[in-house]
Amino acid sequence: MNYTLLELVQQVTGELGVSRPTLVIGNNDPQIIQLLALVNRLGRDLSRQYEWQRLNTEYSFTTVQGQEQYALPSDWLRQIPQTEWDRTSQWPLIGPATTQEWQIYKSAIISDGPNLRFRIADNFLEVDPPTGDLNLSFYYISKNWIDAGGGVTRYTYAADTDKAIFDDSLMVTGLKVQWKASKGLDASFDLAEFRTMLDTIKAQDKSAQKLTLGGLPRNILLTEWNVQDGSFPS
């Protein structure tokens, strides 16, 4: 179970040897106000660091005939590449298109094809051609790294009971680094510990594919690689 905001700040202040607060949100102590600002920045920075499995989110919607632009989810931080699919036709979307390619799609005499093309521009997912009644789906990384309970997530701490999704030790060490740096203190030891911890937690965050040092597995089926050029058996 992860620390609440209050527990996190109490742990950090205890390790730093400064006064431990009884509340964080609504506290008028400049030290606590600064720690709150720093921990919010820390969480946002960590969100951008990696494809965290707890921030991995699926989104789907149905297209409308003639509509080209569809708003991205409100908590969208970044796209997970090559997850864009047309589930109705069971085809992947083609893209993301560059601006030059998109101009070709919109302007060329012949530009239509059987598959939808897409790009992300101005916080919209744009599709071409604008076909209706298709169920489109993709995965993205959410910017909401705070669990407020009851299925509610946030981008910024709003209550002392809010919890970050990140490892407690990582948050404690990272917050100590930021606090010491803001005070002009030597944070080199804590920074080295934070970087090592971050690499370890990234590696443990989700599963991994099996790697082999041998050659590729042989295909027992007939393919272009194992069919003779001529003189086929009668």
Could you say what each language-model-derived stretch is?
Residues M1-S234:
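Glycine-enriched, solvent-exposed interface loops adjoining structured elements
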